[in-house]
Amino acid sequence: MKTLAIDEEQLFLSKTIFEEEVYGEGFSIIAGVDEVGRGPLAGPVVAGACILPRGKIFAGVNDSKKLTPKERGKIRDILLNDPDVCYGIGVVSVERIDEINILEATKEAMAKAIANLSVHPDFLLIDGLHLPHKIPCKKIIKGDSKSASIAAASIIAKEYRDDLMRELHQRYPNYGFDKHKGYGTAAHLAALRAFGPCDCHRKSFAPIRQVV
């Protein structure tokens, strides 16, 4: 167990290299930013922004896609209940996605998440996208697997969006949103063919246009 704890600590520290580089440049409050839900056919796109306290270990923090739902939920609870962790969430609706396209909606969700931080960051580490912003920032490809703060943001955003999709399942039980979270699985596509799209489907996405 001790070896496992040491391994998890080292893994976390290996994901703070980008943060430490930015600290070395004189910045002091670094927020990681990531989005969840660009690809699904239904539901909003959600972004998370997270500021982790420097020097504090959060074992298990990793790319949300590499964690089981149980692991992800546990780490989310640890992050949200830690008084030294600051986080913000941004949500952009299906209607807005259809209006401005998913890329611009993703950027809008990220900007909202940053604005919803209770502490003002002086530097942003952003997963995969160049985000025009007044705060200095750095784009990191696959940042959710390389940066602890981006990984934390991805976990928070993923859990938040999954909760939203479970709520949508209560309103629209025919589609199985609680299982696939809006992604284009075979079961989801079959439901679309059987029932047609509902209000929370993205009408601008090709698979939805084909059944409208």
Curated annotation (Swiss-Prot):
It comes from the Bacteria. GO terms for cellular component: cytoplasm; ribonuclease H2 complex. GO terms for molecular function: manganese ion binding; RNA binding; RNA-DNA hybrid ribonuclease activity. Its cofactor is Mn(2+); Mg(2+). Its EC number is 3.1.26.4. Pfam families: RNase_HII. Transmembrane segments: none annotated. The keyword Coiled coil does not apply. It catalyses: Endonucleolytic cleavage to 5'-phosphomonoester. It is found in: Cytoplasm. Keywords: Cytoplasm, Endonuclease, Hydrolase, Manganese, Metal-binding, Nuclease. Residues 28-212 form the RNase H type-2 domain. One of its GO terms (biological process) is mismatch repair. Manganese or magnesium. Binds 1 divalent metal ion per monomer in the absence of substrate. May bind a second metal ion after substrate binding. A divalent metal cation binds at residues 34-35, 127. Endonuclease that specifically degrades the RNA of RNA-DNA hybrids. HAMAP family: RNase_HII_B. Belongs to the RNase HII family. This is Ribonuclease HII. It comes from Chlamydia caviae (strain ATCC VR-813 / DSM 19441 / 03DC25 / GPIC).
